[in-house]
UniProtKB/Swiss-Prot annotation:
Family designation: Belongs to the plant LTP family.
UniProt keyword annotations, A-Z: Disulfide bond, Lipid-binding, Signal, Transport
Organism: Lens culinaris (Lentil)
Signal peptide coordinates: 1-17
Superkingdom: Eukaryota
GO MF annotation: an example: lipid binding
InterPro entries xrefs: Bifun_inhib/LTP/seed_sf, Bifunc_inhib/LTP/seed_store, Plant_nsLTP
Task of the protein: Plant non-specific lipid-transfer proteins transfer phospholipids as well as galactolipids across membranes. May play a role in wax or cutin deposition in the cell walls of expanding epidermal cells and certain secretory tissues.
Stated name of the protein: Non-specific lipid-transfer protein 4
Length: 110
């Protein structure tokens, strides 16, 4: 019982600040057309990219966002990997990793 309480005390603060994959998916859903080979990203897409970058302001948040992006990239059937990698730059932001199914999110730092 004491161990369970200790785990809850240690894990709860970390979970509270973590970015959810639902939020990542929601923010980037306007990017789907571009990510599957469509023309440049829409203003709504870039707004979502910028919102996500602003929300990921700690190393754990950036790693969580990276893992969500990696998972989402793997679930997009016709993902254009070049467009995925170019997305941040097309939106005028810099993220410290490539949006890819092969990214090692454990190496992402703030």
């Amino acid at each position: 019982c004491v161990v369970l309480v200790m785990c809850m005390v240690v894990i709860a603060p970390m979970a509270e600040g973590a970015i959810s994959c639902g939020a990542v998916t929601s923010d980037l859903s306007p990017c789907l057309t571009y990510l599957t080979g469509g023309p440049g990203p829409s203003p709504q897409c870039c707004g979502g990219v910028k919102k996500l970058l602003a929300a990921a302001n700690t190393t754990p948040d950036r790693q969580a966002a990276c893992n969500c992006l990696k998972s989402a990239a793997g679930s997009i059937t016709k993902l254009n990997t070049n467009n995925a990698a170019a997305l941040p730059g097309k939106c005028g932001v810099n993220i410290p990793y490539k949006i890819s199914t092969s990214t090692n999110c454990n190496t992402v730092k703030f």
